[in-house]
Amino acid sequence: MFTNIHSIARNSSCENELEELMHQIDIMVSHRKVEWEKHVKVLEQKLEAQDRELTEARNLVDEKNHEIGILCKKLEGVDTAQHEMAQNYERQLQALKFQLCKLKKSYEKLHFHQEKHQKNENAAQERSRCELQWLTQKIEEFKARSREWEKQRVFYQDQLKSLDEQRKTLAEKCQLFQKESLSYQEQLSSQKQLQSEAITNNQSEMRRLRCLLDTSQETIRSDGVIIENLKSTVKEITLSRDSLKDENQQLLQELRRCQKQSQNMEAQLYKAKLELQSCNDLLRVPALEERQAQKETANLANQKTAQGEEASFQVTDPRMNYMTSEPEHKSFNLSKSEKYQAENDLHGTEAKNSDLERLRKDIGDLTAKLNQKDVTIATVSRKVSRLERELELKGAQNRQTSMPLSQKDVIAELESEMPQIHAVNKAPQTDSGEVDPWISIKCGEHDKPQKHRSFHGENNSLKPTNYADTRNHSVGSEWESEKSLCPWNTPTLGSATDDDCDLVDNENEWLSLYNSTLYPGLDLPPISYACDQLKDSTNSSLAGSSLISAAEKFLLEETRRASDFEKILNSHIEEMKRNSESTVSRYQSHGQSRHI
């Protein structure tokens, strides 16, 4: 746990240093960008000022030309308007004359009609009066309009005179502007030549600066990609490590649950056997009584035969027959009850043995799974060690030339190896036949039925040698160190039952201390069995010890890998610092030379 916390703290400190470095690099690049942008802006402002002057001169010339065109158009429009107005006035005068003629004719007709019908039709007179009034109003209106039109005609004649004078002055100004435009065009052509030369020089400098910027940005991006790849690999490795830890904890919990169930079943079996023994003792009591009764009857028969009296013998003969038949009947009933009890006991023991076998099979499966996980962890550690060796070799070869390229290759190899590691983790149990003979031997030992207690001493005396042979045959040098650490792999297992009980107590104490140091957050059950069940307890304790040693090995491997990755990250950070310093010094020298 402390090593994990230390590795996590180191990873966090490395990440903080990386972030600070990236922040410093970004600040330096931004400063350089700001300086270059200021220089470019100054050049652009100069170009824009010159362009503005040119555009202003062009706009002045265009405005003058436009004003001349507008004035010409106005003159043409005024001439056409005057001609049209004169035509309109003539038309209106003709229309007025025509209307006056019509009015005169109508007036004469009305006057004639009035004289005719003045006497008979008063209503017609009133109408004629109204029409006369309306006609007089119309005449007055036409007179007022004619006055206004005369005023407008005079005003337009004055405007025509003023426009003629303006046209003359504008023609003089146009000639002056044409002369000025020619001079401006000559100046513009000279300024354009100068500006084109300055623009070409500035563009060449801009291209060179942009190339330098692109190269620096590409190096920074490549470094950022490398850092992100390293971070992603570290995250994936931590996630896989956490998942393996969770799976190991789940398997340990299942193993403990199965061990508890097996302990409970064995305790129930032990109780049932004690009950059977008590029943057998109770059944033996009437058999002993029968034997005593038979002895007494034999003594009585001998005494009575010694007396030799036939009459008394005949009298007592039916009584003796009754006494002899009664114990025979009792013995027959007792034998029947014993057979029935034995059959019931056999059925109960068979059911309990089947449950125990099922539990042992489950325990065997769990141990197989744990061993499969050990195999995957071993493969992962081998691959990581191989990759680290390749990293060291490539680093020693390419340290002077191109370290970032070797790190990219290592990252690519790590990414290519990750799916193989996941495939090994997800492989079925059947693929682990090369490493799992110990598992099959353990399962076979669990599947064996339990013998009578009378042979328990012999089994205990034979067990250590067989277990040592199978263990040495199946597992190689990896498990020898664990075997030397375990306190129960001693030759004292084949001794008497008192020594076995002491050994079990020592094992329990050692396991409680070991579990409290390794797994302080878990409540692990103590492994304690009776002295008459020492065989099963040794098997289960050996399985638990192998799991604990595998877990300890996995933690050591993970801490070692974390430290190696920290070293790799530190080396990469140092290289990034060197690259950033070299780029900064390069740009500083370039900026100084440019200022010079």
Swiss-Prot record:
Residues 8-68, 130-180, 227-284, 337-402 form a coiled coil. Pfam families: CEP63. The keyword Coiled coil applies. Key structural component of the deuterosome, a structure that promotes de novo centriole amplification in multiciliated cells. Deuterosome-mediated centriole amplification occurs in terminally differentiated multiciliated cells and can generate more than 100 centrioles. Probably sufficient for the specification and formation of the deuterosome inner core. It comes from Xenopus tropicalis. Residues 297-316, 447-467 are annotated as: Disordered. One of its GO terms (biological process) is cell projection organization. The keyword Lipoprotein does not apply. This is Deuterosome assembly protein 1. Its main location: cytoplasm. InterPro entries: Cep63/Deup1_N (IPR031470).
